[in-house]
Amino acid sequence: MDRGRRALVPGVGLARKKGPVRRLRAFVLVLVLGLRKGEVLGLTWDLVNLDAAELYVGEQVQRVGGRLVRRQVKTESSEAPLPLPEVCVTALRLRKKQQDTDRARAGDTWIDTGLVFTTRHGTPIEPRNFNRSFDRCIAAAKVPRITVHGTRKTCCSLLAALDVHPRVVMQILRHSKIAVTMEIYTEVPSAATRDALRKLGNLLET
């Protein structure tokens, strides 16, 4: 549990910085929501509602056959909104300001992909570069090493330690089978999902 919290600290703290911090706000979504690397890199603004504090996971960015491709995420759970704790809303608002600045500086060279997390010219971020940036962030924070993929387990462990129902953890991490998350139980209302993420957000603020 302590290891999980320590791993979350660098992304949360850096997400609140107002300087030209690139990719670090994406790490907050990876760490807090357990988003997969391809999912956070494929996140689009049209599927983000900051006022309602929720988002949908609609695409993934992956490298296939030597080129970057965007693929649709089609599962039953991907069609449901994922509620955002305040720390994620803050990170996304800061990211929007950063991207607006990038767009203005790029001028006619800006490529409008609709993606939330992009390069300075609007193009998709190379997944391998995302991994390298994440590794540097963790090393600089002097916390136990954790990979981008490993953050999903960290997030799941944190939610379990907060006594969040396994079915809710399944909703948040969008696993297709409850066995992947933990055990079975009964159906849980969507309000429980939002409450679980609020608990996680409160934990990060303490």
Language-model segments: which ranges?
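Basic, Lys/Arg- and aromatic-enriched nucleic-acid-binding interface segment
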Residues: 1-43, 50-51, 63, 75-79, ...
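C-terminal secondary-structure termini that scaffold catalytic or DNA-interacting sites
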Residues: 17, 52, 61-88, 94, ...
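Hydrophobic aliphatic residues
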Residues: 13, 59-61, 138, 173, ...
